[in-house]
């Protein structure tokens, strides 16, 4: 990094980071609690509803591959500012949404803005907080989960207060405006990576040739599949059990609040040791237990199952990125790897709401979808065994320019 002429203002920087993170899920998390109201206005099958989560996540996957290049060309601060503006405008456009296409297009545009931010922010964290990467990633991801909890819990009330679901969805543009103002205020504390770091960075093409990059991407994608599926379908699942939209939304908010807690606690636990595998296995066990509970006794102990899922998913998301960042020392290289990992991962995760929606349309039940996710999570425990820190250097060794030229 090119160092600033003055010491970075840590508190404003962390505050801005939190405000930015809060904006990365409301565009998706607000849909589920409002789904009944939306379907009363716009007739939608469950398969079509799944597109409201699938397509923005798919857009996130493709846009992730461009984030690092845009940041290298225009600068990290400017790129994130523009992405926040895109998210805010996409949310505001929902004020006039009257068709499924309107909702889908706004979700896709917001997803692209979200992807750009998520592809760039890990590199900023690694460069500005090199000795506290796990803790600050926990704070950042906690903010993301907190935004989801905030949207899930308050959107039905906002809709009742403002009169309809369109206003409830559009209201989240105000949060983007606040984050944009805070991000602009710390523009002097976000400096661009220097040429040496850029030259040493792995390019996307070389990452695609690294099996470990794909393993990390697949692991992230399978874990995120649980998140996207729960985000899209947990409220409708409990509405079918006889719950109101408001109560189902509050359950999702509770789940995401547990994600917030786990997003802080699990990275803090993992930061004590270079080997993150024990904590990864712990959160995967929590995810599996939560899905098994939804299958066997969804109505008897909903708070327990939602809590277990929240703890597991909330810890798995940041830990997956932390493990990826552990493989790289240079901030830009770490940022490029996490962008690649998230790009691959979101392309995988985008399919889970669609698959669950299709299962629901065919079988009239979400049970098979929860079972599939439990099996996938169990399979991930075997992947965790390969994340041994001593093996990291050999997976991403960078050849020197002369050595590369001799080949």
Where are these regions (language model features)?
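Conserved MFS/SLC helix-loop-helix module at the cytosolic interface between two early adjacent transmembrane helices
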Residues: 62-101
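Cytoplasmic helix-loop-helix junction between adjacent transmembrane helices
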Residues: 106-143
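A late C-terminal transmembrane helix in Major Facilitator Superfamily
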Residues: 328-374
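Helix-to-loop junctions at the C-terminal end of transmembrane segments
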Residues: 63-75, 262-275
